[in-house]
Amino acid sequence: MISTNDFHNGLTIELDGTVYQVVKFQHSKTGRGGAFVRTKLRNIEDGGIIEKTFRAGEKVKKAHVDQKNMQYLYHNGDDYVFMDTDTYEQLSISNEQLGDKVDYLKENMSLEVLMYENRPIDINLPTFVELEVEKTQPGIRGDTVSGGSKPATLETGAVVQVPLFINEGDVIKVDTRSGEYIERVS
């Protein structure tokens, strides 16, 4: 059992025999009433999203989730194929399950795949990834590091805001949690 005060994004819980993953949560306190936790939960069976409010401190059953080290190989249509680095077994995860995380997947990237009852439900990306800028407006003479920003399309198709001095072909470091530019690598 886990307290609703300990909720975090990615946590898997069991409610009424169905397993959900916490997508978003917010602790709230009303003026006279008690505190409560508003959540958005994703059903891992069908991908449906529900909103549920819990009383603060309420106990819910935590679903047991295994983590497997895997390597991302390629994508085929709407499916993304991963390989277990121990058994070389391959499995695919749908674009729907991965959501925005596909923007940071690079071929041959090592990561953790979360499994529930031997079925993949999600992935844990590294905190930072290095991606090449494929398309952006050219920098203009006189641009400075402390200047504005411009959109850049990365090799994975993700679009991030980058400083004006970044050019096509540059490799940049991106925070996978927020999608923000961190630094130029080369």
Curated annotation (Swiss-Prot):
It is found in: Cytoplasm. One of its GO terms (biological process) is peptide biosynthetic process. InterPro entries: Elong-fact-P_C, NA-bd_OB-fold, Rib_uL2_dom2, Transl_elong_fac_P/YeiP, Transl_elong_KOW-like, Transl_elong_P/YeiP_cen, Transl_elong_P/YeiP_CS, Transl_elongation_fac_P. SUPFAM superfamilies: Nucleic acid-binding proteins, Translation proteins SH3-like domain. Transmembrane segments: none annotated. Pathway: Protein biosynthesis; polypeptide chain elongation. Its main location: cytoplasm. Keywords: Cytoplasm, Elongation factor, Protein biosynthesis. GO terms for cellular component: cytoplasm. One of its GO terms (molecular function) is translation elongation factor activity. PANTHER family: ELONGATION FACTOR P, ELONGATION FACTOR P (EF-P) FAMILY PROTEIN. Involved in peptide bond synthesis. Stimulates efficient translation and peptide-bond synthesis on native or reconstituted 70S ribosomes in vitro. Probably functions indirectly by altering the affinity of the ribosome for aminoacyl-tRNA, thus increasing their reactivity as acceptors for peptidyl transferase. Belongs to the elongation factor P family. This is Elongation factor P. It comes from Halothermothrix orenii (strain H 168 / OCM 544 / DSM 9562).
